[in-house]
Regions:
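Ligand-binding clefts of soluble mixed alpha/beta catalytic domains
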Residues: 1-305
Length: 305
């Protein structure tokens, strides 16, 4: 290892770096921003203000597709300690995916963050932003708290499948370094659209409160119990209410257990569980590692129009 450490680098670092600046807000407050109930939204902008350099966030298309956040430069007062979740003064805006530019330890990153369901407008905005970062050679940081893409007849008529495919296409084919942090839920196709393990992020970490799976335990239990009840009805067999409740509870317990981050990490579905306060340092380490490899040009596939 010492001999190899003396070898010169193959090429200069591929990612430019400026002098780093600490966040204006204490990263130690991150754990206090996590809700006790995982069904409650995370204050994503407040989380990012405790991770990025100088708490400076330049948001992309802030008023379009508001369920996907693209970062903006925010005034100090917006993210001050008076807005901590454990304070009665804290008011969280509606769930919104977010994209935009910031720096972490001097490295520029394009941040794609969400807090809820992806709609058609959110997916289109996300695809646009990912393409922009790929063209500029800017690394992508995905902050996941996603329950999936919106479903229903109205949203299907509006093209959620087509527009969601644009986001998935852009994420899959962007060759810039991609890092993913699961700070909340990571469920269904939203895991793919937000650069889950199958989409080859350089690193993927999970917070201790994170959950990952095809769907939540409560939803999975209800769906599987409904399927079993419908099957029994077609076959003309009995499926009592007690059997329905027992199957629903059994499936809920199983899905909840397998959604635990320890279950995922034990199977190498990610690169480890990290403390929220260590998120900035882990991202910086991932970016420094990625800077040692050349950034290949991106060749996007065919986007559905």
């Amino acid at each position: 290892r010492r001999i190899l450490g003396r070898l010169p680098p193959a090429a200069p670092p591929s990612l430019p770096q400026r002098p780093p600046a600490p966040p204006l807000y204490d990263p130690a407050e991150l754990a206090g921003l996590i809700p006790a109930d995982p069904r409650q939204p995370l204050p994503m902008r407040a989380l990012l203000a405790r991770i990025v350099d100088g708490s400076e966030l330049d948001e992309f298309k802030a008023n379009f597709g508001t369920t996907l956040i693209t970062v903006r430069r925010a005034p100090r007062a917006q993210f001050g300690s008076q807005f901590r979740r454990d304070s009665c003064n804290y008011v969280e805006p509606s769930p919104s995916p977010m994209q935009g530019f910031a720096r972490v330890h001097g490295y520029e990153v394009g941040i794609v963050a969400n807090d809820g369901i992806l709609f058609s407008e959110s997916a289109v905005k996300g695809a646009h932003f990912v393409q922009l970062c790929a063209q500029r050679g800017v690394p992508l940081l995905f902050m996941q708290n996603i329950t999936g893409f919106m479903v229903g007849k109205q949203y299907e008529h509006e093209g959620i499948a087509k527009h969601g495919a644009k986001l998935v296409n852009a994420v899959a084919t962007a060759n810039v370094p991609k890092l993913t942090v699961v700070v909340g839920g990571s469920f269904g196709a939203g895991n793919y659209g937000m650069c889950g393990r199958a989409y080859s992020p350089r690193f993927m970490w999970m917070w201790p409160n994170a959950r990952i799976g095809i769907m939540g335990g409560e939803q999975a239990g209800g769906v599987l119990a409904d399927v079993r009840a419908a099957q029994a009805k077609r076959q003309g067999t009995e499926f009592a209410d007690a059997d329905y409740a027992a199957l629903k509870e059994r499936m809920r317990e199983r899905f909840d257990a397998e959604a635990d981050p320890v279950f995922a990490t034990a199977r190498l579905w990610d690169d480890g569980i990290i403390e929220p306060t260590q998120t900035r340092a882990q991202i910086a380490l991932g970016l420094a590692t990625a800077a040692n490899a050349p950034v290949e040009p991106t060749r996007f596939g065919v986007f559905r129009m």
